[in-house]
Swiss-Prot record:
PROSITE patterns: FLIP_1, FLIP_2
Keyword terms of this UniProt record: Cell membrane, Membrane, Plasmid, Transmembrane, Transmembrane helix, Virulence
Gene Ontology biological process terms in this record: protein secretion
Membrane topology listed for this record: Multi-pass membrane protein
Protein name: Surface presentation of antigens protein SpaP
UniProt source species: Shigella flexneri
Statement: the UniProt record of this protein carries the keyword Protein biosynthesis: no
GO-annotated cellular components: plasma membrane
Main location group: membrane
Entry coiled-coil feature ranges: none
């Protein structure tokens, strides 16, 4: 039988799980990049949001699989007790070490230091100075870092499509076809180029390789 604290911890975990997946994994970057690519192509609802989010979730699970397995093994090798709040905090610091290393690796450390200092308020800053960040300071810093990186990637992906739009607009203007919408011509051209270059495959591989070293 689970103790009251263990039951509360279990229910809290499953309640917060969707938010942890959305903000505490690489899903946040994948979903933003995919939506920005769709917008850059000039498409509104194709692929649908559900499709893009599903692909982003599957890719995120693929990347996070070793970390999830390591956390589960630490839990099994315990034994772990969740009778008090301190037990839960202790497990988050020791049992989730692989996850903390993942967060730290892909986090802007300046943001992590800011949240660590804010968490400690005006107390001793020794842990932040020794690069020993708590899980609760790494999570917001990681989420903001992933959003920033996703916007950077989206900017570079937008550039070639903007060039195509400008070229099509200039050609239509030179031909005197000012009444025709450039989108009518540019969207099919961008689609052909994107499919011919295997855009989805290249983009997906590049995103995954930011987290996993895959031999050629």
């Amino acid at each position: 039988m689970l103790s009251d604290m263990s039951l509360i911890a279990t229910l809290s975990f499953f309640t917060l799980l969707p938010f942890l997946v959305a903000a505490g994994t690489c899903y946040i970057k994948f979903s933003i990049v995919f939506v920005m690519v769709r917008n850059a192509l000039g498409l509104q609802q194709v692929p649908s949001n559900m499709t893009l989010n599903g692909i982003a979730l599957i890719m995120a699970l693929f990347v996070m699989k070793p970390i999830i397995e390591a956390g589960y093994e630490n839990y099994l090798n315990g034994p772990q007790k969740f009778d008090t709040i301190s037990d839960i905090v202790r497990f988050s610091d020791s049992g989730l070490m692989e996850y903390k290393q993942y967060l730290k690796k892909h986090t802007d450390l300046e943001l992590a230091r800011f949240f660590q200092r804010s968490e400690e308020e005006n107390a001793d800053l020794k842990s932040a100075e020794n690069n020993d960040y708590s899980l609760f300071s790494l999570l917001p810093a990681y989420a903001l870092s992933e959003i920033k990186d996703a916007f950077k990637i989206g900017f570079y992906l937008y550039l070639p499509f903007v060039v195509v739009d400008l070229v099509i607009s200039s050609i239509l203007l030179a031909l005197g076809m000012m009444m025709m919408s450039p989108i009518t011509i540019s969207v099919p051209i961008k689609l052909v180029l994107f499919v011919a270059l295997d855009g989805w495959g290249i983009l997906s591989k590049a995103l995954i390789e930011q987290y996993i070293n895959i031999p050629a």
